[in-house]
Amino acid sequence: MTRLAVLLGAGALLAGCRGGEPRLEFTPARVVSQDTENGATPMFLATPRGERVVGWISAPDGGADGSLHLSVTPAGAAGPRPVVTLRDPLGPIEAHGEAPPQLAADSSGGISVLYAVGREIPGQRWPVSALRFTRSTDGGRSWSPPVTVNDGTEFGAHNFHALTAAPDGSLLATWLDAREGRSGVWMSRSRDGGRTWTQNRPIYTDPTCPCCRTAVAVDAHGAIFVAWRAVLPGDVRDVVVTRSADGGSSWSPPVRARADGWVYPGCPHAGPSLKVDAHGVLHIGWWTGKDGEAGVYYARSDDGGRSFAALPIAVGKQARPAHVQLALDADSGVVVAWDDGLSEMPRVLLRRSADGGRSFGPAAELSEPGVAASYPVVAVYGDSLAVAWSQTTAAEHREKLADRADMKDPKAVMQLPRVGQSEILLRAAAR
């Protein structure tokens, strides 16, 4: 039986640590998914009101019939409210590590979720999906009936999504969509709390890596930034960023966060993470597989995404795909969490910058030795940060890799992701 553990950690950030890096202290893990049979694809959100939202997906017998579970801890509360379980009438909620449900908090206090409902079609090699949205206005106690965000054919190649809330209270969703015959980056916006969504509009229809997640961020003035992995001439698969100053009507030419020049005839399932701080500085983290320069990078832009200054975070000659997540704090701190592709087994590591991303402290290993840990997520709340990730044994990790469908085989069929026999654990630090 596969045991896929998901751990959540919180550690105190040292105040006023301009000259040093924060020390993270973790308490022993405790199970937070005891109300469900299993759990996968952890999500974490810290809202402006101080709520902490933890989410995960479970499925009977560790299969693909996914339900979404959300646990909300109000600001100042000793513990969370009862877990709320969401089912979708269209079908199972996908437990996809590279395309998990996305959480966002808006200025009116709403908590929103964007997720994919998957469906296997007999005779087709790939599952299809629909992007679905739901929102809570009472702190996560109840949730609105789900609506479909993508237009056109409800089920299709709509996935690898991102969600954010703009300063004006509107919600922005981006995703990869192949409705025009090949994968591109698309967007929709809601100005009524997610009840209705605008006509879907393409951001980028040139070749796009079809299985790497998108990322979206909005600055204080309403400028929208979107990042993804483009397929450039020569099969170069580098991460790019574009900007819109008119609400998404037009977009700047995409700019590479770094000229990695990674040539690869496939998709690594490893998209970027993108944030913008209160000063308008853009922060991005990603992975590249270029031989001799492979690994995790971070870059910042002080000119609205026109240019970037990049730093290596964890780089070697070769590296397996890593999944990077960023978080920002109010004191110019930048946190980078990733699953290390340089070691024999993936492990979750974290580095923090106290000077806005100009330099980073040493890496801290958060997962246990001797296991395979992947798909971290990270958030900052108050003077603490939280990191969640998926974990399994080394033997189970190797077995999963061996059972993976080889989609280069024209007869191979990809199934919906399975949850596995997993659980969600919590680690919290004294503040």
Which stretches of residues belong to each language-model region?
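Generic extreme N-terminus detector
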Residues: L4-A5, K411
